[in-house]
Regions:
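Non-catalytic signal-transmission and effector/linker regions of two-component phosphorelay proteins
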Residues: 1-20, 104, 118-133
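Conserved acidic carboxylate
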Residues: 25
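Two-component/phosphorelay signaling modules centered on CheY-like receiver
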Residues: 28-47
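Acidic, metal-coordinating helix/loop segments flanking the phosphotransfer/catalytic sites
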Residues: 48-66
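Active-site residues of response regulator receiver
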Residues: 70
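Acidic catalytic/metal-coordinating carboxylates
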Residues: 77-80
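Hydrophobic/aromatic residues positioned on beta-strands within the core alpha/beta folds
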Residues: 95-96
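A Lys-centered signature of the CheY-like receiver
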Residues: 115
Length: 133
């Protein structure tokens, strides 16, 4: 991986090619970083949302195959969206600043990346979760 964010060797740059991923994050800087890293891996970003209702509408319109989600969005949770995505067999990566025990027990088995995270950890997680699709 090159040092500059968003650039990868050719083999990693196509790793997620053709996948439509959803980003749900209410912190604008983190959302932009996630979008940049996902795009650099070759995925198409269906949308980046800070509200669950907007993300749910996108899931109804688009053929989303996976999602990177914060659990808490300005006082609301993304768990309704998580349930919809899981019902469609979409893999999910939680990106959260909360402690593991703050996640409801029936969602704790889902992959989680703690904020703050670095590019290497994010790419590794994305490969494991979305690379096998």
């Amino acid at each position: 991986m090159n040092k500059r964010i968003g650039t990868y060797p050719d083999d990693e740059g196509r790793l997620l090619s053709g996948l439509k991923l959803l980003v749900v994050e209410d912190e604008a800087l983190i959302a932009m970083e996630v979008e940049e890293m996902i795009a650099a891996l070759g995925a198409e970003i269906v949308g980046s949302f800070s509200r669950v209702t907007d993300a749910l509408e996108a899931v109804e319109r688009e053929a989303v195959v996976g999602a990177i989600l914060d659990i808490q969005l300005d006082g609301a949770t993304t768990l309704t969206l998580v349930d919809v995505l899981l019902g469609r067999n979409c893999p999910i990566l939680f990106v959260t600043g909360g402690a593991p025990e703050s996640i409801p027990e029936n969602y704790r088995q889902l992959p989680r990346l703690s904020k703050p995270f670095n590019q290497v950890d994010f790419v590794r997680s994305a490969k494991l979760i979305f690379g096998r699709r």
